[in-house]
Amino acid sequence: MLYSIGKVVQTHGIKGEVKIKPHTDFDRFVKGFDVIIKDTKYKIQTVREQKDLLLVSFVGYPTLTDVEHLKQQEIYTDEEPLDLESDAFHLPKLIGLKVYDQHNYLIGTVLELVDVPQGYLLRILRDDNGKTVLIPFIDKFIKSVDETSIHIETIEGLI
């Protein structure tokens, strides 16, 4: 089974580096680690941080031309997810979870995670009217996450 761990958002420079937006709260991007992009395995050669992104190069791909085709591609691993701390989770596992407000009222179901420069938004299909809403995935709104549901704190105009 494959597990999504990030996305190549852009190339960087001329020496075969790519910018990666990780989907995980823990470090999967280390030298020597194998990742899968478009059904091909790549071994990580170097990793360095740049703001909320990682700059990564792969063994055997030394030029911009070598990595150009990786732009906007999801990155996977075939290794089991690591055990997480109690306040961490695997972002792809949020899809399909039920979302409740602070009064335990069912708002809807998570359809997808939208990656924006500020972080992630949850696209939720509303249970009451079939419309979708976007909720910022930040501590101000997300109060708890478990294996079956997400509880949020709503404010006027959020939903």
From Swiss-Prot:
SUPFAM superfamilies associated with the record: PRC-barrel domain, Translation proteins
Residue stretches making up the PRC barrel domain: 86-159
Keywords, in A-Z order: Chaperone, Cytoplasm, Ribosome biogenesis, rRNA processing
One Gene Ontology term of the molecular function aspect: ribosome binding
Pfam families found in the cross-reference section: PRC_RimM, RimM
A single cellular component GO annotation: ribosome
Top-level taxon: Bacteria
Cellular location(s): Cytoplasm
Gene Ontology process terms (BP): ribosomal small subunit biogenesis; rRNA processing
Entry note about domains: The PRC barrel domain binds ribosomal protein uS19.
Oligomer status and interactors: Binds ribosomal protein uS19.
NCBIfam families from the UniProt entry: 16S_RimM (TIGR02273)
Cited function: An accessory protein needed during the final step in the assembly of 30S ribosomal subunit, possibly for assembly of the head region. Essential for efficient processing of 16S rRNA. May be needed both before and after RbfA during the maturation of 16S rRNA. It has affinity for free ribosomal 30S subunits but not for 70S ribosomes.
Family membership: Belongs to the RimM family.
Protein name stated in the entry: Ribosome maturation factor RimM
